[in-house]
UniProtKB/Swiss-Prot annotation:
Organism domain of life: Eukaryota
A single BP term in Gene Ontology: SRP-dependent cotranslational protein targeting to membrane
Family indicated by similarity: Belongs to the SRP14 family.
Species of the source: Macaca radiata (Bonnet macaque)
Gene transcribed to yield this protein: SRP14
Keyword Cell wall biogenesis/degradation: no
Subunit details: Heterodimer with SRP9; binds RNA as heterodimer. Component of a signal recognition particle (SRP) complex that consists of a 7SL RNA molecule of 300 nucleotides and six protein subunits: SRP72, SRP68, SRP54, SRP19, SRP14 and SRP9.
Protein name listed in UniProt: Signal recognition particle 14 kDa protein
Example GO molecular function: 7S RNA binding
Length: 74
């Protein structure tokens, strides 16, 4: 803790507030527009990847059934 005499309270408060203002740049909120665009693009890419991965399995399940001649040959 910092001990400040009653005569120097105003001086201390001014110096401390100036210090905080000088270092406030690192605390400013950042622009979130770019972040939402990136997350939407990432979500779309992930959805496309899931759809692409599911497509081959869907094609395999909808294949035409084997004919009796093809089954007998196996």
């Amino acid at each position: 803790s910092t001990v400040v005499s009653s005569k120097e309270v105003n001086k201390f408060q001014m110096a401390y507030s100036n210090l905080l203002r000088a270092n406030m740049d690192g605390l400013k909120k950042r622009d979130k527009k770019n972040k939402t665009k990136k997350t939407k693009a990432a979500a779309a890419a992930a959805a496309a990847a899931v759809a692409a991965a599911a497509a081959p399995t869907a094609a395999a399940t909808t294949a035409t059934p084997a004919t009796p001649a093809a089954t007998a040959a196996q």
